[in-house]
């Protein structure tokens, strides 16, 4: 029997559906608004949600994304990704090691890893990762203890030498997503700029357009 094919990481905005941002709106509702705006990659980040509620929400968002042709990844929780049949996981320094995530998920799902430099990107590749999240590119308030800001020049340098596709993370929004794309990013992660917009769906549409403009130099 052939191994299941791994999803392809789509280029463009990488939208995070975070339970700590706009908590009065459900994760499923937030994800629906993101996808309606053209998001093709949604990551569920559920640090505050009880496990059973998180599992139910993940299953609903996975189903939503499948219907709309988008991918759904889960932050940190490999168990939730497996139980909900998500498209993959993203792990950080304090999460399940990438090689263990790959062993648990098998070859048919994506594994992303947060790194700080080219050395980390090479280690992630050796561990079986499909892509790396690199940053923070800009100052960010989403993380309680953010790492030192890279800036666009250092970010672009790592992108050039990385053996894996790079997702720009940290402080990315409509005002700067084009510059992240122009620096060579495969994707650009957006959290608050999308979820706190007056119209989430319209903001995502504009983020998609801005990324493409930066990517192609329009």
Curated annotation (Swiss-Prot):
Mg(2+) binds at residues 76, 95. Binds 1 Mg(2+) ion per subunit. One of its GO terms (biological process) is thiamine biosynthetic process. Its EC number is 2.5.1.3. It catalyses: 2-[(2R,5Z)-2-carboxy-4-methylthiazol-5(2H)-ylidene]ethyl phosphate + 4-amino-2-methyl-5-(diphosphooxymethyl)pyrimidine + 2 H(+) = thiamine phosphate + CO2 + diphosphate; 2-(2-carboxy-4-methylthiazol-5-yl)ethyl phosphate + 4-amino-2-methyl-5-(diphosphooxymethyl)pyrimidine + 2 H(+) = thiamine phosphate + CO2 + diphosphate; 4-methyl-5-(2-phosphooxyethyl)-thiazole + 4-amino-2-methyl-5-(diphosphooxymethyl)pyrimidine + H(+) = thiamine phosphate + diphosphate. It comes from the Bacteria. This is Thiamine-phosphate synthase.
